[in-house]
């Protein structure tokens, strides 16, 4: 039934043709069940395991690897001789990587679907209904309830469907609907129509929603919606319809894979075409087909060299390390790619209650009357420190602490707060914090009584458990609570009838009242001044109400409660308590005692975090279910709005937002920083608009109602105290529910992206070097310098360790002083691409050069000419060009070992270059990242392992090197550091101004100024090594002059 909240009880019952006392007939139930189906959320049909596995191979980079593995496998199958076994290593390792990658992908996909299934925990199993086949109420399975059923609900029940209340059988009916609406306190319901057809769920006071809990009272109602038609069902549909967007990193890696695949294809085809003239060489037995297959194998090796096989593993490891660091800061990351997405977050949409605020109501101001003269009066105003439930704080007057027992008015005010109250404080030993037991508002009053300590109770020596309610206990020992007149909407107050525990002539029964100021003060005839009471005049009443209005609408927007006493109430026997309509009669002729102002205070650290966000170019938007006045006031206190800032076009209620046309809604999302009184659909709509501006949005939430928006946003952030649905729909969970934790996570995300750029640069320059090496050997006609199994070893193991260690690079000091990076900016800029290419070309040339040095100039080498080396395929005994040359020498493992050792060593130097994007090694020495130093040592150890431990040299087709050969390796490798230092110098001083303080051109740079910040221990360590390496003769120059 549409808009059931706007209809009268009679209209709703008439619509379903049902009587409240008898319920539906079995015939009606049958028809309605056929029409509306079962009252349950349908199980989500997830993807099959096969579909999920196939999905993992849709990535372009993965498909290229798969193709390379298949071709390698086919070629290995037809391999002859000793290389048969080693030929299978390459396809096997590639397939192993792909399988591991697929397993991780499938596992993450499976986890994502759990969010929809978690909604089922809010479906009650049973319901109580009235039907015509039985005279009394009957319990049936909740899934068998149909629209039109008359349902009975009572305290502790979970609401089985969306219900329009028809009658309330208790004084009040309170419902905890926080999981659906986000309201932090239970809501009082009634049966009157709510005439507004566009009312938000919070304002539908005559409706109960499926999955919410009855906090107090008993009532009956008619079911108006079941299953997917309920409000929780609509949330489920929205979640099903929400497609998960790919993270910026995933998009960048996809683009990178596409570019890489095109480059690889072009180079492979080029290598194959360049060598067409060699297809008929004698070494191939004169067979054109065998020559074509040989160069096809080289092209496949090139593909393997060009693909950074280790990249997926290193990225996963880096993100996993990032999640561990975030977990220490109370941010638990559920989705690995979202770690990096946090780094480019440009908008944070945050809940108010519990995230920006403590979600711990506390009294911060109160007043009593000081003196009254006719229509004029003066007040004693007090402020209270402490913003949590801990019973620690002071009462101040004019910024000076006071003893509350010196004020008679405060003693009575504390008595009312303690007795007109069903809440208590509890010390949680496991968490080490004080928590509320009962309503938040009443707990704030309990905490106030503890801070006031009006009877000077001795508190020293008490345990924290005993301290929790020590002062309240003293008051409760003096007065005994006889009964309570429950809160009702019409009088907006509640009261307790108390008698003294030790009756005397002077102490008599009293009634203590608390409630909304306008309701209570209207029924007050007197005012308490000290220990006396004086009549209340209109002038005094006006003064009191003006102060209360100021508190309620000022910068704090306090929630005010008036406290009053009935000094001579009727005796209990004279009261008719069965009918709550009589309560207002007993709460008249009251004496006004004082007023308290409370609020859910902002967290202490939030203001500085909001300021940090502003510095970092991140817009913070508060989205709350609370009213607009309170929301704007909190925004001003934490710095989202300035103290005097005009919020006309920057703060909207859900209703105001809906009334705007689409263009105005778009502008609102572009400028607004506060949305109040919102529903779940508003959150999703706001996220959609923000995404249309290419903003990267982080959205917080804790209730079932937040799940669709959490799933839609790039970063869904659930509260640690939130529902299972919210947690499973999110990418990150805040263990401490604190906004400042989000900002710390954003900072970590930015650092991770910077480090990721460094290790991607490191791995790609390595792969470019390998491609250049294979391309040069093919183009020059040299023997193979590197084979696929060696390339795999370098890409996965030797390079993988330093790349992972680069994830530990320290973050830049100004990381939160820069605006968020554009998620569309390429992973590799033009300048970075040039750097990759320049370094990569040197790596490739150095690797080929090392192999050539052994052939041409090494003491233990064959010392062939350049012509003989580049035409080695024509080597035969009867060829005069190769007279005196043993053709078997061209298959020696030494040149391969030299090439592989240079590649590994040069990559270790390159890892040192990657310590910082633009900072010199002289100013940022290797020990700035001790993990990198350790990983370089481990990588070199693994290289020595495959060189010197049998049978590994046989598998990798290499052989041990002597000292001279190692000196040559160092001589060829070290210049890469000098080369990158030059490129860094250019970037620092010419391409990225402002990163370092440049001396004005007019001033000469003194030696001390130029050398400022240089790490002299590093200089002293490295210089002797460089001098020794380059002063030792290794016949290096012979290679060029021979």
From Swiss-Prot:
Changing residue 683 to E: In DD; depression. Disulfide bonds join 875-887. This is Sarcoplasmic/endoplasmic reticulum calcium ATPase 2. It is linked to Acrokeratosis verruciformis: A localized disorder of keratinization, which is inherited as an autosomal dominant trait. Its onset is early in life with multiple flat-topped, flesh-colored papules on the hands and feet, punctate keratoses on the palms and soles, with varying degrees of nail involvement. The histopathology shows a distinctive pattern of epidermal features with hyperkeratosis, hypergranulosis and acanthosis together with papillomatosis. These changes are frequently associated with circumscribed elevations of the epidermis that are said to resemble church spires. Darier disease: A skin disorder characterized by warty papules and plaques in seborrheic areas (central trunk, flexures, scalp and forehead), palmoplantar pits and distinctive nail abnormalities. It is due to loss of adhesion between epidermal cells (acantholysis) and abnormal keratinization. Patients with mild disease may have no more than a few scattered keratotic papules or subtle nail changes, whereas those with severe disease are handicapped by widespread malodorous keratotic plaques. Ca(2+) 1 binds at residues 304-305, 307, 309, 795, 799. The modification Phosphothreonine is found at residue 441. Interacts with sarcolipin (SLN); the interaction inhibits ATP2A2 Ca(2+) affinity. Interacts with phospholamban (PLN); the interaction inhibits ATP2A2 Ca(2+) affinity. Interacts with myoregulin (MRLN). Interacts with ARLN and ERLN; the interactions inhibit ATP2A2 Ca(2+) affinity. Interacts with STRIT1/DWORF; the interaction results in activation of ATP2A2. Interacts with the monomeric forms of SLN, PLN, ARLN, ERLN and STRI1/DWORF. Interacts with HAX1. Interacts with S100A8 and S100A9. Interacts with SLC35G1 and STIM1. Interacts with TMEM203. Interacts with TMEM64 and PDIA3. The active site is at 351 (4-aspartylphosphate intermediate). It catalyses: Ca(2+)(in) + ATP + H2O = Ca(2+)(out) + ADP + phosphate + H(+). Ca(2+) and ATP binding cause major rearrangements of the cytoplasmic and transmembrane domains. According to the E1-E2 model, Ca(2+) binding to the cytosolic domain of the pump in the high-affinity E1 conformation is followed by the ATP-dependent phosphorylation of the active site Asp, giving rise to E1P. A conformational change of the phosphoenzyme gives rise to the low-affinity E2P state that exposes the Ca(2+) ions to the lumenal side and promotes Ca(2+) release. Dephosphorylation of the active site Asp mediates the subsequent return to the E1 conformation. Residues 787-807, 931-942 are annotated as: Interaction with PLN. Isoform 1 is widely expressed in smooth muscle and nonmuscle tissues such as in adult skin epidermis, with highest expression in liver, pancreas and lung, and intermediate expression in brain, kidney and placenta. Also expressed at lower levels in heart and skeletal muscle. Isoforms 2 and 3 are highly expressed in the heart and slow twitch skeletal muscle. Expression of isoform 3 is predominantly restricted to cardiomyocytes and in close proximity to the sarcolemma. Both isoforms are mildly expressed in lung, kidney, liver, pancreas and placenta. It is an enzyme of class 7 (translocase). Its cofactor is Mg(2+). Belongs to the cation transport ATPase (P-type) (TC 3.A.3) family. Type IIA subfamily. Nitrated under oxidative stress. Nitration on the two tyrosine residues inhibits catalytic activity. Serotonylated on Gln residues by TGM2 in response to hypoxia, leading to its inactivation.
């Amino acid at each position: 039934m549409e808009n059931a909240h706007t209809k009268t009880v009679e209209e709703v019952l008439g619509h379903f043709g049902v009587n409240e006392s008898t319920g539906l007939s079995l015939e009606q139930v049958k028809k309605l069940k056929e029409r509306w189906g079962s009252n349950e959320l349908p199980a989500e049909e997830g993807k099959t395991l096969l579909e999920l596995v196939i999905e993992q191979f849709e990535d372009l980079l993965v498909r290229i690897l798969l193709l390379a593995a298949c071709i390698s496998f086919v070629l290995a199958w037809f391999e002859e001789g000793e290389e048969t076994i080693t030929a299978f290593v390459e396809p096997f390792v590639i397939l192993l990587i792909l399988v591991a990658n697929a397993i991780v992908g499938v596992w993450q996909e499976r986890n994502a679907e759990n969010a929809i299934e978690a909604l089922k925990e809010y479906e009650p199993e049973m319901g109580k209904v009235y039907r015509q086949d039985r005279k009394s109420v009957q319990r049936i399975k909740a899934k068998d309830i149909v629209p039109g059923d008359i349902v009975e609900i009572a305290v502790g029940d979970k609401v089985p469907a969306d219900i329009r209340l028809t009658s309330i059988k208790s004084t009040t009916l309170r419902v905890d609907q926080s999981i659906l609406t986000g309201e932090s306190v239970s809501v009082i319901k009634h049966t009157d129509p709510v005439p507004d057809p566009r009312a938000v769920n919070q304002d539908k006071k005559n409706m109960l929603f499926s999955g919410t809990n009855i906090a107090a009272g008993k009532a009956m109602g008619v079911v108006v919606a079941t299953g997917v038609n309920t409000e929780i069902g609509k949330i489920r549909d929205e979640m099903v319809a929400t497609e998960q967007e790919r993270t910026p990193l995933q998009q960048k890696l996809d683009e990178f894979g596409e570019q890489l695949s095109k480059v690889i294809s072009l180079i492979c085809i080029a290598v194959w075409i360049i060598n067409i003239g060699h297809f008929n060489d004698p070494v191939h037995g004169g067979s054109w087909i065998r020559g074509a297959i040989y160069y096809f194998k080289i092209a496949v090796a090139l593909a393997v060299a060009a693909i950074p096989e280790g990249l997926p593993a290193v990225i996963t490891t880096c993100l996993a390390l990032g999640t561990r660091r975030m977990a220490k800061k109370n941010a638990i990351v559920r989705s690995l790619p979202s770690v990096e997405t946090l780094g480019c977050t440009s908008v944070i949409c945050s809940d108010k209650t519990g995230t920006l605020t403590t979600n711990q109501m506390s009294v911060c101001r109160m007043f009593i009357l000081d003196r009254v003269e006719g229509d004029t009066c003066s007040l004693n105003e007090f402020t209270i420190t402490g913003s949590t439930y801990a019973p620690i704080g002071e009462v101040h007057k004019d910024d000076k602490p006071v003893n509350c027992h010196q004020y008679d008015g405060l003693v009575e005010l504390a008595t009312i707060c303690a007795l007109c109250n069903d809440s208590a404080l509890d010390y949680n030993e496991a968490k080490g914090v004080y928590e509320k037991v009962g309503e938040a508002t009443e707990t704030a009053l309990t905490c106030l009584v503890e801070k006031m300590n009006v009877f000077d109770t001795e508190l020293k020596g008490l345990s924290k458990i005993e301290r929790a309610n020590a002062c309240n206990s003293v008051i409760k020992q003096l007065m005994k609570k006889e009964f309570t007149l429950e809160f009702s909407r019409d009088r907006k107050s509640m009261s307790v009838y108390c008698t003294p525990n030790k009756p005397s002539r002077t102490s008599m029964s009293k009634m203590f009242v608390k409630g909304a100021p306008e309701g209570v003060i209207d029924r007050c005839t007197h005012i308490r001044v000290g220990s006396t009471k004086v009549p209340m005049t209109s002038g005094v009443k006006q003064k009191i109400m003006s102060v209360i209005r100021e508190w309620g609408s000022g910068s704090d927007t306090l929630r005010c409660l008036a406290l009053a006493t009935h000094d001579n109430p009727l005796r209990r026997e004279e009261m008719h308590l069965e009918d709550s309509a009589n309560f207002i009669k007993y709460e008249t002729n009251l004496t006004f005692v004082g007023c308290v102002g409370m609020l859910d205070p902002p967290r202490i650290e939030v203001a500085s975090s909001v300021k940090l966000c502003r510095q970092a170019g991140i817009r913070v938007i508060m989205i709350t279910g609370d009213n607009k006045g309170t929301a704007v006031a909190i925004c001003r206190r934490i710095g989202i709005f300035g103290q005097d800032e005009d919020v006309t076009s920057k703060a909207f209620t859900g209703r105001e937002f809906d009334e705007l046309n689409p263009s105005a809604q778009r502008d609102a999302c572009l400028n607004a920083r506060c949305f109040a009184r919102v529903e779940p659909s508003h959150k999703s709509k706001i996220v959609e608009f923000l995404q249309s501006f290419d903003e990267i949005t982080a959205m917080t939430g804790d209730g079932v109602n937040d799940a669709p928006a959490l799933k839609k946003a790039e970063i869904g952030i659930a509260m640690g105290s939130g529902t299972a649905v919210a947690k499973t729909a999110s990418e990150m969970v805040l263990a401490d529910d604190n906004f400042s934790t989000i900002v710390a996570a954003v900072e970590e995300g930015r650092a991770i992206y910077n480090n990721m750029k460094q290790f991607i640069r490191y791995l790609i320059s390595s792969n470019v070097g390998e491609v250049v090496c294979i391309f040069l050997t093919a183009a020059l006609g040299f023997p193979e310098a590197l084979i696929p199994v060696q390339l795999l070893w370098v890409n996965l193991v030797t390079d993988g360790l330093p790349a992972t260690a680069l994830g530990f690079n320290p973050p830049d000091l100004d990381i939160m002083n820069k605006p968020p990076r554009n998620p569309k900016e390429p992973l590799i800029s033009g300048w970075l691409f040039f750097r990759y290419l320049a370094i990569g070309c040197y790596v490739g040339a150095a690797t080929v050069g090392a192999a050539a040095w052994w052939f041409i100039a090494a003491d233990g080498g064959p010392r062939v000419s350049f012509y003989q080396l580049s035409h080695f395929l024509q080597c035969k005994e009867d060829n005069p060009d190769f007279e005196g040359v043993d053709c078997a020498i061209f298959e020696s493992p030494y040149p391969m070992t030299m090439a592989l050792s240079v590649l590994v060593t040069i990559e270790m130097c390159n890892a040192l270059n990657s310590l910082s994007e633009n900072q010199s090694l002289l100013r940022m020495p290797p020990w700035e990242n001790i993990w990198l130093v350790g990983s370089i040592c481990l990588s070199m150890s693994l290289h020595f392992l495959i060189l010197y431990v049998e049978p590994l040299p046989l598998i990798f087709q290499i052989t041990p090197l002597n000292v001279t050969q190692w000196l040559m390796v160092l001589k060829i490798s070290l210049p890469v550091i000098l080369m990158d230092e030059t490129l860094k110098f250019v970037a620092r001083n010419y391409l990225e101004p402002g990163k370092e303080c440049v001396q004005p051109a007019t001033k000469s740079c003194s030696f001390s100024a130029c050398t400022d910040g240089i790490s002299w221990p590093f200089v002293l360590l490295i210089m002797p090594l460089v001098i020794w390496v380059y002063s030792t003769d290794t016949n290096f120059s012979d290679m060029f002059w021979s």
